[in-house]
Design a protein with these regions (language model features):
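NAD(P)+-binding Rossmann beta1-loop-alpha1 motif at the extreme N-terminus of oxidoreductases
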Residues: 20-71, 77, 146-147
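Catalytic, metal-anchored helix/loop core of enzyme active sites in primary metabolism
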Residues: 189
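Aromatic-residue-lined binding/catalytic grooves and analogous aromatic/hydrophobic interfacial grooves
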Residues: 193
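Rossmann-like NAD(P)(H) cofactor-binding subdomain of soluble oxidoreductases
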Residues: 67, 75-80, 84-87, 91-151
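Short, Lys/Arg-enriched N-terminal segments with co-localized hydrophobic residues
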Residues: 5-20
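Internal alpha-helical scaffold of NAD(P)-dependent oxidoreductase catalytic cores
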Residues: 122-132, 148-185, 196-206
């Protein structure tokens, strides 16, 4: 059984690597959702290199020890090294963060926005230039690698870029492509429904 499991993991690794030529993903912010995404990506070897920036050194130490990721306290260093850059911070921090990194990102970088209420247009406006942006909303079951994520693409994103990002979100659950106009509704339903299910289970247990 152990050999079969290893074979399955190897097949997943091959399949993910066939989806993208991008080698490095970076995370700015390593809260619960960021950690869940990092775990799925590292377990499935979606990228050769994972960079993580966080203001709490203890978070970085844990992630480095557990997954071997590269860590930094500098947002700029992570931005400079990332082919795909996930902005995993609270919505209120987006303007200041992007102002810090906007001149440091690679020209063909894919920005992944996972902040509720921050649109693709908002991100482009903060960067002050036309840049590839993907809006994504994972939900809390990501913490047990069972997320149901919604993703939306801007017009600059290629088919290869789409496959790359879908491989990210499929690594810790499943994902569906939706129009960005539907993202608020998706957030309300998929973001809140797990909490209701947990309440049902707790009530039944009582």
């Amino acid at each position: 059984m152990r050999a079969n499991k290893k074979s399955f993991q190897e097949e997943r690794h091959i399949r993910f690597k066939e989806l993208t030529m991008r080698e490095t993903i970076g995370f700015i912010g390593a809260g619960n959702m960021g950690k869940a995404m990092i775990e799925g990506i590292c377990q499935n070897h979606v990228f050769n290199t994972v960079w993580v920036c966080d203001h709490h050194q203890e978070n970085l130490d844990v992630l480095h020890e557990k997954y071997g990721v590269k860590t930094s306290l500098s947002e700029i260093e992570v931005a400079q090294n990332s082919d795909v850059l996930v902005l995993s911070v609270k919505p209120k921090h987006y303007p200041k963060l992007i102002e810090t990194i906007k001149d440091s990102v690679k020209s063909d970088v894919i920005i992944v926005d996972i902040a509720a209420g921050v649109t693709i247009l908002d991100v482009k406006t903060y960067f002050g230039k036309n840049i590839k942006v993907i809006k994504a909303m994972p939900n809390t079951p990501a913490l047990v690698l069972s997320a149901m994520s919604a993703i939306s693409f801007d017009d600059l994103v290629t088919e290869e870029d789409k496959a790359c990002v879908q491989s990210i979100f499929n690594s810790f659950g499943k994902c569906e492509v939706v129009e960005e106009t539907m993202m608020d509704a998706v957030t309300s339903v998929s973001g809140s429904s797990p909490a209701y299910v947990f309440m049902f289970i707790e009530a039944m247990a009582d």
